[in-house]
């Protein structure tokens, strides 16, 4: 069962679902909560490596995964981030989310931004039961013009579904979970698989 706005407000009030900072009620509509872009980004460098072998996370050409992207860069609220056409950037949400073990979240882009070419997640849009932390967005500019992003702009919407029962292995209790208590922009940890 998908939660409606009234349900979302009740889950937040009971602190079963935690979104920090607590969302203003104007951000909770229909079946979603609007969330904002954070101020932490990681950019991919231009490089000479020809490909990444996803089976072992090695880059053909001698580079490691950490060498193909910048360290975390923190932007001020007024500082624009320019996303060129055909470019991918990792960034975090402003909000931190703590999910209970009987709820799954879904991250969706905003239609108004998508119509300008902005994809806010490459494919990873599920927020697992037991998740705790910022959400990393894999933002891609599929449009023809450079897009200007700014910290704290409304960027996405979260919706939530109640599960038939609490999961046996919530994300926060799994030993192999690679992104537990994620704070900021954590790059791919495919090498830990």
Curated annotation (Swiss-Prot):
Pathway: Pyrimidine metabolism; dUMP biosynthesis; dUMP from dCTP (dUTP route): step 1/2. Transmembrane segments: none annotated. DCTP binds at residues 110-115, 128, 136-138, 171, 178, 182. GO terms for molecular function: dCTP deaminase activity; nucleotide binding. It comes from the Bacteria. Catalyzes the deamination of dCTP to dUTP. This is dCTP deaminase. It comes from Buchnera aphidicola subsp. Acyrthosiphon pisum (strain APS) (Acyrthosiphon pisum symbiotic bacterium). The gene is dcd.
């Amino acid at each position: 069962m998908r939660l409606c706005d009234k349900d979302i407000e009740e889950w937040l009030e009971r602190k079963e679902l935690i979104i920090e900072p607590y969302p203003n009620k104007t951000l909770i509509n229909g079946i979603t909560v609007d969330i904002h872009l954070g101020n932490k980004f990681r950019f991919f460098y231009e490089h000479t490596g020809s490909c990444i072998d996803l089976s072992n996370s090695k880059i053909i050409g001698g580079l490691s995964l950490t060498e193909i992207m910048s360290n975390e860069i923190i932007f001020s609220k007024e500082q624009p981030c320019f996303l060129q056409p055909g470019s991918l950037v990792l960034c975090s949400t402003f909000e931190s989310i703590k999910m209970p073990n009987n709820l799954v979240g879904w991250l969706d882009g905003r239609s108004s931004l998508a119509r300008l070419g902005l994809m806010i997640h490459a494919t990873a849009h599920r927020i697992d039961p037991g998740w705790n932390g910022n959400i990393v967005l894999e933002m891609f500019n599929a449009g023809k013009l450079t897009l200007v992003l700014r910290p704290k702009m409304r960027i996405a919407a979260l919706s939530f579904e109640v599960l038939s029962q609490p999961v046996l292995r919530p994300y926060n209790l799994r030993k192999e979970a690679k992104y537990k208590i994620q704070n900021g922009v954590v790059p791919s940890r495919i090498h830990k698989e």
